[in-house]
Amino acid sequence: MALTLKAMEYFTTALRHGNIAKAAVELNIAASAISSAIDQVETEFDLTLVTRQRARGIQANASGREVARKCERLLEEYQSVLNEGAELRHALSGTLRIGYYAPIAPAFLPPI
């Protein structure tokens, strides 16, 4: 199974909060979805990336911090691509055609 952007977002949000429940509230989803995303990321890398403790929440180990850092960078780049695409949609494009009335054109246009 391939790692999804959504799983990366859930994983990094959970680590940023240090708590699955708080991440679930921020993302407006069930805590079980966050937990499943963390499992998916760990399965994809075949590593244990976080330590889960009921009283303390979750903490990333060294591998988890590295994966989270790279996931955050990838998510930021993805958002940047989306923003640039939106800007391109609103950019001017096409051919500009200029018409003129020949008898008065010399008064307004530079000589060629």
Label every PLM stretch briefly:
Residues 42-60:
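A short LG(V/I)-centered, amphipathic sequence patch enriched
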Residues 44-45, 67-89:
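Alpha-helical linker/hinge and terminal dimerization helices associated
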Residues 4-7, 31, 64:
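The N-cap/first-turn positions of alpha helices
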Residues 32, 83, 89-112:
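N-terminal winged-helix
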Residues 10-14, 67:
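Short alpha-helical "packing" element that flanks the helix-turn-helix/winged-helix DNA-binding module
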Residues 30, 36-40, 112:
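Residues within the DNA-recognition helix of helix-turn-helix
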Residues 13-30:
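Short helix-boundary/capping micro-motifs
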Residues 17, 26, 40-48:
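Residue cluster at the C-terminal edge of the helix-turn-helix DNA-binding motif
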